[in-house]
Amino acid sequence: MPLWELWFFLLALFLAWLTPPGNGNEGSMAGSCPCNRRISSHSPPTDHDMRHLRKYLNHYQHCTSYVRFQLPRGSVCGGSSDQWVLKLMGCFDRGECGRAHARTVAHQQHLAPQNTRVPELPERAPPDSSTPAQTNLPSTLQPTQKPTLPEGMPSLAKKLIPTSETDTSTVGHSLGAKSEARENQEQLGKNVGATAGTSALVPVLSLLVIIFLLTGVLLYVMCKKRQEQSRQYPPDPQLHYVPVASNINT
């Protein structure tokens, strides 16, 4: 036997020794449906184990002749026809158990205190400052009469029954605020108008400056061109002399 075949055979034996055998249809650890714990049909789980499975169940998987329940720290398998297996699958399918159900319940319990609100007391309407104080009194009382209040409530009466001085000061304050707001608005309008006029004048001045610059450049170019032409074609001196007829008498 060649040496490489011997090494290959020893390697295959070593790998086979590392892989643990499966238990019936359970499959090995390298299979598609492994189980960390197999519960026999003759010894179903206790109530404590069932509560643990209902609470921490992530999902389940149908294998050949059993069902595998996946937990956070391993998997538990049971026969497909076992009563506890059928109950656990039905509970998980209805959403009544499992980790998803536990998270939903915890979320609802967290939202419950936030949704519970203390009923707010109705706010008392503020007194109307534009009407006299007598309009806030009941119609059965005369303007000169004062409402009878129980003893120990003088401060509450002062707060609930506004006086004419308070109304007058409130009206004066509101009128002063209105006049001040009107003056501020007029001043703001003037400032806006001045700003708009200045912003409209800037483009006009810029356009005039550009026109003046272009005109100056054009005049400079024309003068330069005329000077060059006069240098290239000097004037004929004979054109400046006019022939004069000779005097016969002389």
Curated annotation (Swiss-Prot):
<dbReference type="GO" id="GO:0005615">
    <property type="term" value="C:extracellular space"/>
</dbReference>
<feature type="transmembrane region" description="Helical">
    <location>
        <begin position="201"/>
        <end position="221"/>
    </location>
</feature>
<feature type="compositionally biased region" description="Polar residues">
    <location>
        <begin position="128"/>
        <end position="147"/>
    </location>
</feature>
<protein>
    <recommendedName>
        <fullName>C-X-C motif chemokine 16</fullName>
    </recommendedName>
</protein>
<keyword id="KW-0325">Glycoprotein</keyword>
<feature type="region of interest" description="Disordered">
    <location>
        <begin position="105"/>
        <end position="186"/>
    </location>
</feature>
<dbReference type="GO" id="GO:0006898">
    <property type="term" value="P:receptor-mediated endocytosis"/>
</dbReference>
<feature type="disulfide bond">
    <location>
        <begin position="33"/>
        <end position="63"/>
    </location>
</feature>
<keyword id="KW-0145">Chemotaxis</keyword>
<dbReference type="Pfam" id="PF20902">
    <property type="entry name" value="CXCL16"/>
</dbReference>
<keyword id="KW-0472">Membrane</keyword>
<feature type="disulfide bond">
    <location>
        <begin position="35"/>
        <end position="77"/>
    </location>
</feature>
<dbReference type="InterPro" id="IPR048585">
    <property type="entry name" value="CXCL16_dom"/>
</dbReference>
<dbReference type="GO" id="GO:0034341">
    <property type="term" value="P:response to type II interferon"/>
</dbReference>
<keyword id="KW-0812">Transmembrane</keyword>
<feature type="signal peptide">
    <location>
        <begin position="1"/>
        <end position="24"/>
    </location>
</feature>
<dbReference type="GO" id="GO:0030335">
    <property type="term" value="P:positive regulation of cell migration"/>
</dbReference>
<feature type="topological domain" description="Cytoplasmic">
    <location>
        <begin position="222"/>
        <end position="250"/>
    </location>
</feature>
<dbReference type="GO" id="GO:0005044">
    <property type="term" value="F:scavenger receptor activity"/>
</dbReference>
<dbReference type="GO" id="GO:0016020">
    <property type="term" value="C:membrane"/>
</dbReference>
<feature type="topological domain" description="Extracellular">
    <location>
        <begin position="25"/>
        <end position="200"/>
    </location>
</feature>
<keyword id="KW-0202">Cytokine</keyword>
<comment type="similarity">
    <text>Belongs to the intercrine alpha (chemokine CxC) family.</text>
</comment>
<dbReference type="GO" id="GO:0034612">
    <property type="term" value="P:response to tumor necrosis factor"/>
</dbReference>
<dbReference type="GO" id="GO:0005041">
    <property type="term" value="F:low-density lipoprotein particle receptor activity"/>
</dbReference>
<comment type="function">
    <text>Induces a strong chemotactic response. Induces calcium mobilization. Binds to CXCR6/Bonzo. Also acts as a scavenger receptor on macrophages, which specifically binds to OxLDL (oxidized low density lipoprotein), suggesting that it may be involved in pathophysiology such as atherogenesis.</text>
</comment>
<keyword id="KW-1015">Disulfide bond</keyword>
<dbReference type="GO" id="GO:0010818">
    <property type="term" value="P:T cell chemotaxis"/>
</dbReference>
<keyword id="KW-0732">Signal</keyword>
<keyword id="KW-1133">Transmembrane helix</keyword>
<dbReference type="InterPro" id="IPR026296">
    <property type="entry name" value="CXCL16"/>
</dbReference>
<dbReference type="GO" id="GO:0008009">
    <property type="term" value="F:chemokine activity"/>
</dbReference>
<feature type="compositionally biased region" description="Polar residues">
    <location>
        <begin position="163"/>
        <end position="172"/>
    </location>
</feature>
<dbReference type="GO" id="GO:0030307">
    <property type="term" value="P:positive regulation of cell growth"/>
</dbReference>
